[in-house]
Design a protein with these regions (language model features):
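PLP-dependent class I/II
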Residues: 1-226
Length: 228
């Protein structure tokens, strides 16, 4: 399926499920999973996802990683909605390890990809969702999904087939090096692992400087470094 943006499709999925039951977001992960819903009371920031829809960015915008606890969060869930926008920003070795960690949950997962970030087509917000053929949500929502995605499916297919994956990988490699150099130049900790796109820091002494307070949640300062 495809939509005008990945956020459109994810918002529809969360809204449809939250109309019937609770939806779980991993604490500290992406706030965008809930902003389009009219059922805020059913969208929970909690790690206990048993038998419910679990939503997570891969890697998480909490800290730029996919942790063991996050994998457990997905394994316990009845279904998963995975936002893969930042997956290409991991190093090749980490992408391989992350893909292997996700393999057991793919059969129950909806995979959401934004061409604007995940595949570097920054002039487009086009989003694609990959849904297993026998996923239970297809029986419930396929007619609706087909109705509002049919216009974008052909556009998405042509855009994807035109991608030069080697060129995209080169861009990600250059960005990763630029971010590392920027962190060094500012005297900030350099964490080699995880996404170069987002880095999280826990301030020493617990005091957060005033300019960084808007970027702080759950005691972590998060920087989206590609926009600097």
């Amino acid at each position: 399926y495809a939509a005008g943006s990945d956020v459109d499709f994810m918002a529809h999925v969360v809204e449809a499920v939250a109309a019937r039951e609770d939806v779980c977001l991993y604490p500290g992960d992406w706030f965008g999973f809930r902003v389009g819903s009219t059922h805020q009371e059913r969208i929970k920031w909690e790690p206990d996802s048993r038998e419910r829809l679990a939503c997570l960015c891969v890697p998480s915008v909490r800290n730029g990683h996919l942790t063991t606890e996050m994998v457990g969060f997905l394994e316990d869930a009845g279904a998963c909605l995975l936002n893969l926008n930042l997956f290409p920003t991991l190093s090749p070795a980490e992408r391989q390890a992350t893909a292997e960690a996700l393999t057991p949950v793919l059969g129950k997962s909806i995979l959401s990809i934004s061409f604007s970030r995940g595949f570097g087509l920054t002039a487009s917000q086009l989003g694609v969702a990959l849904v297993p053929r026998h996923h239970p949500y297809r029986a419930k929502y396929a007619q609706t999904w087909e109705w509002f995605t049919y216009f974008f499916n052909g556009i998405a297919a042509r855009a994807f087939l035109a991608l030069d994956l080697d060129a995209v990988a080169k861009v990600d490699s250059d960005r990763r090096e630029w971010v590392a150099e920027w962190l060094r130049s500012k005297g900030l900790p350099l964490i080699e692992s995880g996404s170069y796109y987002v880095k999280a820091f826990r301030p020493a002494g617990g005091e957060v400087p005033e300019p960084l307070r808007p970027l702080t949640r759950d005691g972590l300062v998060r920087l989206s470094l590609i926009h600097i």
